Amino acid sequence: MKLGQKLGKVGVAAWVVLSALGSAQANQKFCVYDMLGATGDLYNMTKDYAVAMQRNGVTIELKGYTDERVATEDFRTGQCDAVIATAFRIRQFNSVAGSIDTLGSTTIVRNGKIDIAGSYDVVRKLIQTYASPAATKLMTEGNYEVSGLIPLGAAYPIVNDRSINTIEKLAGKRIAAFDHDKAQAVMIQRIGAQPVSADITNFSTKFNNGAVDMIAAPTLAYKPLELAKGIGKNGGITRFPIMILTYQMVINRTKFPDGFGVKSREYWSSQFDRAMQLIKQADAGIPPATWMDLSAENAYKYTLMLRESRIDIAQKGLYDKRGLKVIKKIRCNVNPADPECTTKSEEDWK
């Protein structure tokens, strides 16, 4: 073999090796939705995450978004290697993880009362369960893998009139419904109210301007979205969790080393208490007079109503039955005395 041919082959081999190294060392682009963009709490948590992942050999480049539709679309079209957004948007990439953010699925009723601490314990155990390597199959759909779950807080009913204090009084009222979560409109219609098309960029504006009578939102949104304007002197926030919301991270698995998704989920599981601290601070920041409480009878009745609605919506194909089955098991682990734990509801689907 001639020297020139040998050198040529060596050159090609070197180019292949260097290309592989360059590809491995390229920064991974993360699109991060936060209602406050790059100044928000989630974005700040993600900066710490990036430092932690660098120790695992992955260098992350963050880009903040205030519109999660744009963030998820940039991810879907390959402009980002990973995205963080609410479960409503991430559900298109993994419906099992998206089952966390479903009507009443994580709510615990104990001794006839809503147990909010117990409800968050369900979310904690779910996040721990899905952080396990054994859950990788459930967390993966095609090239997409859920690589983090972060609690955002309970979605509470927020109304512009305190007289709207029962389900019956919501009949005919206008309620914001996200276009990309079809289950919301289904539920609103079930109670005889009127769904008004909205998304995360404008639902608060519609409430503050009086275009809708009710929205559901976590307390973390109260100050940034200036919800006090819509609540005014006559409105309030009902201390009844319609669901507990989560931020979720999903990656394109082809862009990351094997096993990265598990390491990432484990990291975010370790940040649960940090996220809860932010939620508790936001809860404490709501003026005491703004809160409204349901009777124990109605709290239990509405929880059962949400359960019936959740099952119906799952039968319509809008919720993932596998995910709901996992959540049922964890609810019954947290509160085994609940009568539902003696039934096969949400376990044996027909």
Regions inferred by a protein language model and the residue ranges of each:
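Bacterial N-terminal signal peptides
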Residues: 11-20
